Structures are given as structure tokens and as C-alpha cells.
Amino acid sequence: MVFPSEQEQIEKFEKDHVAQHYFEVLRTLISKKSVFAQQVGLKEVANYLGEIFKRVGAEVEIDESYTAPFVMAHFKSSRPDAKTLIFYNHYDTVPADGDQVWTEDPFALSVRNGFMYGRGVDDDKGHITARLSALRKYMQHHDDLPVNISFIMEGAEESASTDLDKYLEKHADKLRGADLLVWEQGTKNALEQLEISGGNKGIVTFDAKVKSADVDIHSSYGGVVESAPWYLLQALQSLRAADGRILVEGLYEEVQEPNEREMALLETYGQRNPEEVSRIYGLELPLLQEERMAFLKRFFFDPALNIEGIQSGYQGQGVKTILPAEASAKLEVRLVPGLEPHDVLEKIRKQLDKNGFDKVELYYTLGEMSYRSDMSAPAILNVIELAKKFYPQGVSVLPTTAGTGPMHTVFDALEVPMVAFGLGNANSRDHGGDENVRIADYYTHIELVEELIRSYE
């Protein structure tokens, strides 16, 4: 099989009127900030998407009864026996904060050296426009769709999809029984293989706070008075071993271990080797797992306790000789099947008390359960076979990713097979500065989604 080169894909993209039209839609989408955490632009972008889908004949429902509006767009086939294909996406993004390094304005889509750059170009606005491009390209040459197609677009995915369960419960009758749900996004790995996965880790996030005194104290008392930051650091250290294993009683007993097929998929996985991760991220510290299979199992199938940030004391110019009275940390546990967010936090509370750190106060912020698809479902196997036609380096199949999303919520509501694949690359820098996708990958995703629609003929 002969595959087009990257330059040939770029040229096809530039000559494709449908793709170019929705590229301009993407430019507009990226220019419209839509950040749930800051409550910025959510209704504006939801309404803009509604208009875009209405223009091409979709039945559009915008539900503004939630903090972030939901947008649902239906394209119906006239076939009485038509199956249903669902695309789940989100239009919210993380902020483009001042501590991120951007070469150009993150909210002005830019193109350089075969790449598109902008906040949301991969996560997840670019996936919306690419998938709509694929649908429109199919409809250009056909009077009817071979499959019903529904788009579900939410605006709170980056904040744990706060209302998705309620929304799906209200609309489940319109969506339950679908043949397949294509998840929000996906990526090619460093070997240029398309990653196809069917699950994700869950998460529980929480704040840990310590108050050691009414006021900051002169540091001359450091040998006799405990300070908030030292107390908090010792408490956190007691929860994790040097190799990264979580030291919380009863946690691992509830973990659902991967089955033989899932471990077999891990054996054939070509990406996330320890050396590759060190190279991509320029790691300066030793890895917690050096042996390949132990590294991969920990990455995909084990929970992880992470510190997102720590704050305490003086951070200004020069010195300030104090014992800070307060310290806080933002923490998370990445969850796997068998672990429930509130239960995990309760176990951590009990462990801190047992370890002698009862003065640490914990505050739950958000949580999501984990999920793993059955990758042998016929609709998922169809995607895997179709993808092989478009990616010269092949595909890499995994039952889960190490990231987090509301797959569990969606499956509970709709009971539909779910698969994730997309247009990102191994260095798309989602959530960081210079978020990007290759133009060639963007166009290949359009072609694959169009082929997926065609496969229902």
C-alpha cells in the first residue's frame, strides 16, 4: 500500500474546499476564549457551534440550564435500519496562563512549518472541526447518510465534566443503543503510530492545608517550633514511597488488575518506553520505573499520587527570616478501575491520621471514575482495521490511556462501545505553551473519519 507523504497531505488539505472552510471555523473558535475555570466565553462558543451545525442541516439543541451549555447536533439517515455513530467533544480549554511560553498569541490560530498552533487546536476544538469536515465531505457526494450521526459537545471537560452525568441522564433515550461513540481526541505516538484506545484513568483532586500558628514566627524559633511547611512536607512524604508506590492502606487491594488480553496489548505497545519519555521531556531526575514492562504497567494500570503545586511562606526578592504559619498543596490521585474518588480520599485521611498528621486538613475538589472498553467489540475492531489504511507506521492499540476524562460517566448513561483516536502528535503540548497539531495529521483524521462514515454503507 502506498501512503501519501506529509507534504502531499498538506497540499490535499490546501486544495480541499470543505477542509479550508472549517479551518476558518477553527480559526474563529480558537479566537473565542472558552475556559470553564474562569467562566469565560462558554455561552458564546456554544451558540457559535450551534449556528455552525445548523447551517449544514443538523437538528441542534443547546441546553443552557447548566453552568456550561451543552450542544447536541443530530444528522439523521433516512434508512429505517440505520445505526447511530456518536462523536463526543468539548469546546472548553485550559487557560493560556502567563507562565506558559507561546511563540505567538495562543488565541490567534497560526501556521508555521506544517503545524497549526493555538489554544484548543488539539484539545479539543480542532477535533470538532475535523470531524465536521469529514461529515460534510461525505455529504458532498451523497444524498443521504448511511448512519445517524450525533455530536455531543460540552463546556466543562477540563473541570471534570461537572454536569455531564445529569445531562446524559436527561437525554439518554436519544443516544442509548448507538453502535459506537468516538471519544474527544487522540494522538500519534513518537513512532508515528496512531494510538487507538478505549479507556482512561479516573482522578480525585484535593487541597491539603496546614495552619501551625496564628502568625508567622521569627525563624530563630526554628529549632523548637514546628512550621506549617515542614509539617505538610513530612505528611506528604509519608504517603508515597521513593519508587512512587502509594503508601495508603487498603488502596491497592481494591485495584482491578489488567487481564491477560490487556497485558498482551501492553506487550506490543511501541511508545512510552522509559528512554523515549526521558528524551521527549528532557528529564533531569531519575525515572521511578526503569524496566520497560514495569514502567508501562505503572503508567497505564496503576494509581499515582501527584503533587500539582505547593505554596507557603515568602517568595519575594531577597530573604525573610520566618517560620510560615500556613502551607497548602494541591494534590491528585490518578485512579484505575476499582477505585472511587471519595473512598480514596477517605483512605488518605485515615492514613494521615495513623501517621500522626491529623493537623493536615483535606478538601475535596473534584473526582471522576476510570473506565476501560472491551477492545474486541466489532465497532472498535472496524475502526482499527480502517485506520491501518491511513497510517504507514501502523496503529498501536491500548485498552486505556493514562489521562482522565468522563468515559465512565458516558458508559454508565449510554452503554455504548467507546474508542479514542485523533489528530494529535507525540509533542502536541496539550495544556502547555505552543499547543499544536500537524496539518497532515489533521487532514488524515478527516479522511479516516470520512472512511468510518462510509463503512456503514
Question: Residue ranges of each PLM-predicted region?
Answer:
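Flexible glycine/proline-rich, aromatic-decorated loop/lid segments
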Residues: 195-211, 421
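N-terminal helical capping/dimerization or prosegment-like subdomains
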Residues: 2-99, 326
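Acidic, glycine-rich active-site loops and adjacent beta-strand->loop/helix elements
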Residues: 91-93, 115, 152-160, 184-189, ...
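Active-site metal-coordination/substrate-binding segment of hydrolases
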Residues: 82-153, 444
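An extended, acidic, His-containing surface patch that forms the Zn2+-binding/catalytic region
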Residues: 80, 191, 247-326, 334-347, ...
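A short core secondary-structure module
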Residues: 166, 222-244
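Acidic/histidine-rich catalytic neighborhood of metal-dependent amide-processing enzymes
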Residues: 124-199
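A common structural junction motif
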Residues: 91-92, 239, 243, 349-358
